[in-house]
C-alpha cells in the first residue's frame, strides 16, 4: 500500500514537471521492492524511473530499470506493458550505441502486438532499418505506422523518418516534402529540429550554401532551446545525495544499478 502511495505521488510530481521529486518518490516506492507482489505496479515504477533517467540522458542508469520493467510485465503476461517497456528499452540501447539490441527490442515488441498496433514501435524499427540500408522493410513499417496513427499530429514523427528514408534513397523532392511538413507543423520541437537537420544536410549535398547556413542556424537555436528545457546535469548531481540517503543502501545499488 505504501509503495502505491509513493508511486502516485511520483506520478503527480512527474505530471507537474518536477522530475527530481518524482524520482525520489519512485525510489521510495521501491524501498521494500522484494515485498511487493504487484508486478503491474513494479513494472510501472521501474518504467517511469527508467524514462526519467533516459529523459535526462543518464542512459546507463535507465537501462537496469527498463530491463526490470520488461521482466515485470512478462511475469503477468501483460503484452501491452511489455511492448511499451521494450520500446523504451530499445531507445536506451540505441542511445548507448547498441543498435543490434535496439532492433531486437523493437522486433520483440512488434511480435507481442495483437490487434492494437502501436505506430511508434514500427517507426523506430524503420529508422533502425534505414541505418542498415533495409529500405523496403523500413518503408513497409512506415506505411503501417501512418495507417494506424490515432491523431493527426502523431503523423509527424513518421514523416520525419520518411523524409530521412527518401533522402538516403535519393528521392529529394519527396524528402523535402515530408521534412518541410515537420518543420511547419510538428507539435514537438524535437521533430521540428530533425526536419531542419535533414533539410540542412540536403542543402549541403546540393551546394546550396546560403540555404544550408540558414537551416543550420535555425537548427542550432532550436536544439539549444530543447536542451535548456532538460537540465541533464541535475539528476546526475543528485546521485551523490541518493547514495547517502536511506532510499539507496548498498544492497539497493548493487541490485538495481547492475545491468
PLM regions: where:
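TPR/Sel1-like alpha-solenoid repeat signature
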Residues: 2-13, 25, 32, 42-53, ...
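Coil residues (strongly favoring Ser/Thr
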Residues: 33, 73, 79, 100-101, ...
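Hydrophobic positions within repeat-based interaction scaffolds
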Residues: 100, 139, 173-176, 180-259
Amino acid at each position: 500500500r505504501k509503495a502505491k502511495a509513493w508511486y502516485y505521488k511520483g506520478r503527480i510530481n512527474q505530471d507537474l514537471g518536477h522530475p527530481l521529486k518524482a524520482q525520489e518518490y519512485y525510489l521510495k516506492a521501491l524501498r521494500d521492492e522484494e515485498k511487493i507482489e504487484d508486478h503491474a505496479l513494479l513494472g510501472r515504477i521501474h518504467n517511469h524511473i527508467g524514462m526519467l533517467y533516459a529523459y535526462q540522458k543518464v542512459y546507463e542508469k535507465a537501462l537496469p530499470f527498463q530491463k526490470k520493467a520488461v521482466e515485470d510485465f512478462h511475469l503477468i503476461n501483460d503484452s501491452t506493458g511489455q511492448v511499451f517497456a521494450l520500446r523504451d528499452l530499445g531507445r536506451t540501447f540505441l542511445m548507448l550505441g547498441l543498435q543490434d539490441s535496439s532492433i531486437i527490442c523493437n522486433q520483440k515488441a512488434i511480435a507481442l502486438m495483437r490487434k492494437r498496433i502501436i505506430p511508434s514501435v514500427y517507426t523506430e524499427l524503420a529508422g533502425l532499418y534505414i541505418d542498415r540500408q533495409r529500405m523496403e522493410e523500413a518503408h513497409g513499417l512506415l506505411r503501417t505506422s501512418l495507417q494506424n496513427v490515432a491523431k493527426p499530429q502523431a503523423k509527424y514523427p513518421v514523416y520525419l523518418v520518411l523524409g530521412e528514408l527518401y533522402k538516403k534513397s535519393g528521392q529529394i523532392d519527396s524528402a523535402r516534402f515530408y521534412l518541410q511538413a515537420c518543420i511547419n507543423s510538428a507539435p514537438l520541437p524535437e521533430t521540428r529540429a530533425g526536419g531542419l537537420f535533414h533539410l540542412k544536410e540536403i542543402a549541403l549535398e546540393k551546394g546550396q550554401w546560403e540555404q544550408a547556413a540558414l537551416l543550420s542556424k535555425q537548427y542550432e537555436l532550436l536544439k539549444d532551446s530543447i536542451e535548456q528545457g532538460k537540465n541533464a546535469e541535475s539528476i546526475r548531481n543528485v546521485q551523490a545525495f541518493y547514495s547517502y540517503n536511506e532510499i539507496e543502501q548498498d544492497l539497493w545499488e548493487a541490485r538495481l544499478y547492475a545491468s
